Amino acid sequence: MADIDNKEQSELDQDLEDVEEVEEEETGEETKIKARQLTVQMMQNPQILAALQERLDGLVDTPTGYIESLPKVVKRRVNALKNLQVKCAQIEAKFYEEVHDLERKYAVLYQPLFDKRFEIINAIYEPTEEECEWKPDEEDEVSEELKEKAKIEDEKKDEEKEDPKGIPEFWLTVFKNVDLLSDMVQEHDEPILKHLKDIKVKFSDAGQPMSFVLEFHFEPNDYFTNEVLTKTYRMRSEPDDSDPFSFDGPEIMGCTGCQIDWKKGKNVTLKTIKKKQKHKGRGTVRTVTKTVSNDSFFNFFAPPEVPENGDLDDDAEAILAADFEIGHFLRERIIPRSVLYFTGEAIEDDDDDYDEEGEEADEEGEEEGDEENDPDYDPKKDQNPAECKQQ
């Protein structure tokens, strides 16, 4: 049995050596043809694949032999380049600090528009006919006859029901339209989120550590007494001394929620469960009531606390990572473009971006597959040499 294994291993090693010899000795179009044929043969041999995988696994986390073989004087120059890279990261950090200052400046310019949005949503201000005029995209245009029919239908519906104030359930609809947020919203959260009037972002003052606060403004409701719920995100825009090359712009370092003053019996983040326990000796049964945590959007305001040593278990790390993503998404996308998420247009744009990338990849894959599966395909007829893509 050992002889058979040794023989198979020798054959595998020989096959791998054949690949290396083809690369070293052959040149030109003939090399490409033979390499392609040999690659196909190897990919169909599970033993060769296993041997290749073993070799690749051995290369993980190991420096390239070329760098290790460089003369000492060259390595010194490489170190000089690394020091330049650190200085680049420090300049980049200053750049992002100025970007944060610009965000603070332009937030003041955006605010009157967001205030008007708030007033329209909450029936404080009724927009004029001119403000309500909107020219649809060409693809959305319909005939005058259909427009008139739709107008009559709308008028009938308006007569049948009471005139709604503002835009009902605006923010709840936004949340339900976005997968990242709808996953957080439970059925018992929806009656509360119907009372959400506005979401604002406030940036830290000039000269203060970089941070931003999300403010959720609620109208009086039967669930809690808070008028505003807040979530504060602390950020850092400087390279880490222990790993300066990992710097890629500002990062969220931590977050703090707020206490929700729930009215009696209205805390949706907790639920009461009842368990029956049977006494081993007497056989009597008793019912035990226990309060446990409950899935809810409002857990967003009670993130895991990061201990002083910074060590978190896997669950807490996953929760915080998702929390940071949600906070960033609310700040960068939802608050500035909420109406487009309400109508679904922003979601369609996002989907189109992903679809286009996916379609391009699919088309490339189909073309490659068609060539290999075509019995009349002759690689020699392909006169265009493979391009070398430099990253």
UniProtKB/Swiss-Prot annotation:
A motif (Nuclear localization signal) lies at residues 273-279. The modification 5-glutamyl polyglycine is found at E359, E360. Pfam families: NAP. Residues 389-391 form a propeptide. One of its GO terms (biological process) is positive regulation of neural precursor cell proliferation. The keyword Methyltransferase does not apply. The modification Phosphoserine is found at S10, S69, S143. InterPro entries: NAP-like_sf, NAP_family. SUPFAM superfamilies: NAP-like (SSF143113). The modification Cysteine methyl ester is found at C388. Belongs to the nucleosome assembly protein (NAP) family. Histone chaperone that plays a role in the nuclear import of H2A-H2B and nucleosome assembly. Also participates in several important DNA repair mechanisms: greatly enhances ERCC6-mediated chromatin remodeling which is essential for transcription-coupled nucleotide excision DNA repair. Also stimulates homologous recombination (HR) by RAD51 and RAD54 which is essential in mitotic DNA double strand break (DSB) repair. Plays a key role in the regulation of embryonic neurogenesis. Promotes the proliferation of neural progenitors and inhibits neuronal differentiation during cortical development. The NAP1L motif is required for the histone chaperone activity. The acidic domains are probably involved in the interaction with histones. This is Nucleosome assembly protein 1-like 1.
